[in-house]
């Protein structure tokens, strides 16, 4: 146990140990007090509900007649020949239930409840036109997003009314300059999305100039549908209203990082989910999240702070299980097409998502972060050579996950050397809390060693004062000078690197 800001943190190997503890017992429904509950629909996308499985996810929000999802995936990075590496959205799904089921003017009752414990969202509404229920979750074990829709329509059904499920991708500029600059060519980032159908599925295929391609597949179960091609970039499934409407929507997303044939694999994911049955899929989904929550328990005297702790843990479990680290600037939760400020990752901000994960026994969520930076060792070593050292590596503050050192020549960052050592610190925390010596030896230590070697080669000896010093250097975003001596940030990180023992 550690006392951290009045928090009692107790780590256990599994839930059985918790229940057997003589200290206290945790109610099976303890986490329900941290459910996110709306008693009226939220039409602003940025106030929607986050759902994800660590790789696939996005926000869900309301329209007067249904719901909208922006579908995102952690590895959809476009790498154009001339331009920055940019994380693209996959697309959007719109579900229109045919009547104003969420209109403020017509609501008699409403509740939307995001269960952190089960990683699912349940929505209920009642209007003079219909009583509706929607349940949505992203399978923890496969890239399949499930939306279960039910509607009991009242009195006379509106003539010609239909349920419409639409899949689209329009794309956009990323506006990565944080309002200070923007690409005036609004066609950049649109991609070449095309929709088609294969049997009863809508297939949306996208390919970017940098080589990324991906597929979204959408299937509706339990009700007959007609597929209508709206445009090159949008298709809809239409089903006439009946007094009692029940159907399930399945969405899968596969990228060229996952498969050489994303379309075939996306369809295969839906086939496997259907054969397994959604009941069995959901049981395994709940089992994964039960295990996730059982790995640690936190109680805080301040309920509001405890809410923040658990929603943050939920968000990391929902977004840090893919190929790359969670982007600090929106994660999987962006909603405005491809708009994402600071498109280039800044480590100063990225690291904050990973602070404390090892302590709370979520070391597995550190793996995308660790392995992304280990893959950047060759580029890091090349940059250190340019800075004049024989050995070692450097990671610039602003970079992309392909290893492009974006800020290598920025005046306010050019002699900031600390990101690699900060990365090393988080890597060391993984080992400290797992004691995985093989992973330390084969993955973590090679990076840490090179980060330490840079300082060993770069430090200079002062014959007069009989001490080492570092020059030129600068702290983060130091606009005034890149030629400072003995910056405190470097001194601190040097101490950290050289007090971490090496594997035997």
Where are these regions (language model features)?
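Substrate-binding groove/exosite segments of carbohydrate-active enzymes
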Residues: 47-51, 59, 281-443
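C-terminal, helix-dominated tail/subdomain
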Residues: 471-497
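Conserved small/polar residues in nucleotide/adenosyl-binding loops
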Residues: 498-504
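Bacterial Sec-dependent N-terminal signal peptides
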Residues: 1-22
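Short, surface-exposed recognition loops and adjoining beta-strand edges that mediate ligand/DNA contacts
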Residues: 328-343, 460-477
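Conserved functional hotspot residues or short segments at active or partner-binding sites
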Residues: 448
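Beta-sandwich/jelly-roll carbohydrate-recognition scaffolds of carbohydrate-active enzymes
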Residues: 21-304
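An active-site-proximal structural segment forming one wall of the substrate-binding cleft
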Residues: 451, 455-458
């Amino acid at each position: 146990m550690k006392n951290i800001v009045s928090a009692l943190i107790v780590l256990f190997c599994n839930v059985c140990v918790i229940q057997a503890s003589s200290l206290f017992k945790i109610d099976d429904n303890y986490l329900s007090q941290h459910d996110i509950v709306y008693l009226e629909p939220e039409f602003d996308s940025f106030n929607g509900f986050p759902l994800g499985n660590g790789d696939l996810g996005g926000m869900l929000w309301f329209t007067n007649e249904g719901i909208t999802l922006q579908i995102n995936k952690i590895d959809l990075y476009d790498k154009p020949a001339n331009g920055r590496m940019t994380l693209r959205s996959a697309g959007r799904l719109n579900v229109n239930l045919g009547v104003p089921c969420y209109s403020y003017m017509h609501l008699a009752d409403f509740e939307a409840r995001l269960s952190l414990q089960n990683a699912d969202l349940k929505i209920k509404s009642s209007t003079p036109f219909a009583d509706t229920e929607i349940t949505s979750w992203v399978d923890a074990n496969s890239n399949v997003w499930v939306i279960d829709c039910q509607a009991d329509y009242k009195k006379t059904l509106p003539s010609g009314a239909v349920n419409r499920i639409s899949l689209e991708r329009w794309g956009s500029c990323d506006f990565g300059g944080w309002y200070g600059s923007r690409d005036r060519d609004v066609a950049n980032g649109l991609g070449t999305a095309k929709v088609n159908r294969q049997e009863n599925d809508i297939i949306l295929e996208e390919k970017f100039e940098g080589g990324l391609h991906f597929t979204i597949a959408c299937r509706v179960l339990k009700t007959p549908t007609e597929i209508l091609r709206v445009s090159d970039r949008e298709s809809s499934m239409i089903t006439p209203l009946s007094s009692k409407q029940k159907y399930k929507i399945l969405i899968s997303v596969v990228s060229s990082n996952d498969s050489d044939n994303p379309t075939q694999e996306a369809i295969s994911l839906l086939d496997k989910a259907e054969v397994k049955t959604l009941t069995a899929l959901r049981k395994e989904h709940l089992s994964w999240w039960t295990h996730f929550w059982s790995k640690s328990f936190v109680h805080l005297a301040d309920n509001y702070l405890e809410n923040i702790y658990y929603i943050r843990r939920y968000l990391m479990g929902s977004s840090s299980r893919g190929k790359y680290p969670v982007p600090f600037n929106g994660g999987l939760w962006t909603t405005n097409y491809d708009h994402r400020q600071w498109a280039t990752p800044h480590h100063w901000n990225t690291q904050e998502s990973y602070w404390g994960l090892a302590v709370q026994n979520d070391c597995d969520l550190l793996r995308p972060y660790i392995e992304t930076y280990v893959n950047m060792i060759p580029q890091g070593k090349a940059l250190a050579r340019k800075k004049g050292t024989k050995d070692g590596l450097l990671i610039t503050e602003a970079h992309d996950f392909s290893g492009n050192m974006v800020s290598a020549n920025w005046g306010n960052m050019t002699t900031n050397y600390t990101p690699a050592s900060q990365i090393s610190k988080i890597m060391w925390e993984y080992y400290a809390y797992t004691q995985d010596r093989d992973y330390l030896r084969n993955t973590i230590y090679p990076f840490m060693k090179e980060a330490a070697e840079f300082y060993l080669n770069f430090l200079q000896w002062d014959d007069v004062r009989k001490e080492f010093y570092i020059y030129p250097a600068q702290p983060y975003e130091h606009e005034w000078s890149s030629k400072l001596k003995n910056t405190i940030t470097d001194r601190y990180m040097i101490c950290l690197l050289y007090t971490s023992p090496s594997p035997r």
